[in-house]
């Protein structure tokens, strides 16, 4: 069968970032081991263009319409073969309007297409036309893009489920932060507390956040006991363990 004849470009059972080639688009490098970039449609870029210099860490980086992205149906073997025959890497994505779940569609794209082609992830293949509730946009975007990034798939992301330009950019960057792909603010890890916790974990965590929130890129763990705490904070830069 096909699965026996084709080796996927990623290992679905362990994390390793897909080994795509590096492209430079609008002055930003993406692909390979480069930073995962944030895309935005031209219309939304125009809406925030007057305040980009004041947007801090939530700036849009690349305009989708100017990126040269090639969008295909990953089930279309003719389109897949065309991409695999190209000698130069191209930015690729899944076409809008397909009757596929986002995660399945991008996993199939990564499976079928040569890994040299960087992938632009989307939170939805059916962008809403009217106003949307923020939570209705947040949850699918976090699930779809976050899952794929944790698979090692994706060199850039595009969030369109949230219509507000500034809010959609914040959502995109927060997904990258939560998945460990870009750290632009202090990252905190705290245990849920249990019977071994002998202090108010919630209020202590808030005090620590208030004192350290300016430490961009630092990961701080707050643990409730000395039993599991040291192990759970192994990936942190600094840790606080209560008695």
Language model: regions and residue ranges:
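Catalytic alpha/beta core domains of metabolic enzymes, predominantly
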Residues: 1-27, 76-223
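Short, glycine/charged-enriched secondary-structure capping and boundary segments
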Residues: 53, 109, 137, 236-237
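Conserved beta-strand positions in the central sheet of alpha/beta enzyme cores
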Residues: 71, 157-158, 240
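Active-site mouth loops of central-metabolism enzymes
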Residues: 34-47, 69-75, 126-138
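A mid-to-C-terminal "edge-of-domain" accessory segment
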Residues: 1-66
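Flexible, charged surface loops at secondary-structure boundaries
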Residues: 30-32, 63-65, 83-88, 233-234
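C-terminal accessory/binding modules appended to enzymatic or scaffolding proteins
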Residues: 32-34, 44, 48-51, 200-243
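Active-site regions of enzymes building and remodeling cell-envelope glycoconjugates
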Residues: 54, 59, 66-78, 237
């Amino acid at each position: 069968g096909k699965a026996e004849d084709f080796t996927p470009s990623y290992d679905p059972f362990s994390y390793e970032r897909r080994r795509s080639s590096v492209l430079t688009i609008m002055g930003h490098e993406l692909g390979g081991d480069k930073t995962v970039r944030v895309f935005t449609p031209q219309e939304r870029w125009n809406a925030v263009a007057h305040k980009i210099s004041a947007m801090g860490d939530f700036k849009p980086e690349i305009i989708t319409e100017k990126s040269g992205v090639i969008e295909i149906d990953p089930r279309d073997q003719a389109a897949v073969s065309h991409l695999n025959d190209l000698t130069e890497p191209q930015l690729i994505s899944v076409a809008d309007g397909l009757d596929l779940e986002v995660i399945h569609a991008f996993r199939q794209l990564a499976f079928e297409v040569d890994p040299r082609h960087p992938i632009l992830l989307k939170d939805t293949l059916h962008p809403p036309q009217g106003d949307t509730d923020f939570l209705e946009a947040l949850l699918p975007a976090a699930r779809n893009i976050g899952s794929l990034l944790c698979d090692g798939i994706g060199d850039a992301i595009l969030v369109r489920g949230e219509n507000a330009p500034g809010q959609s950019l914040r959502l995109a960057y927060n997904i990258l932060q939560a998945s460990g792909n870009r750290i632009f603010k202090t990252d905190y890890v705290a245990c849920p507390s249990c019977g071994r916790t002998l202090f108010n974990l919630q209020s202590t965590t808030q005090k620590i956040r208030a004192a350290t929130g300016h430490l961009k890129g630092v990961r701080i763990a707050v643990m409730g006991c000395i039993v599991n705490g040291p192990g759970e904070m192994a990936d942190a830069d600094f840790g606080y363990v209560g008695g």
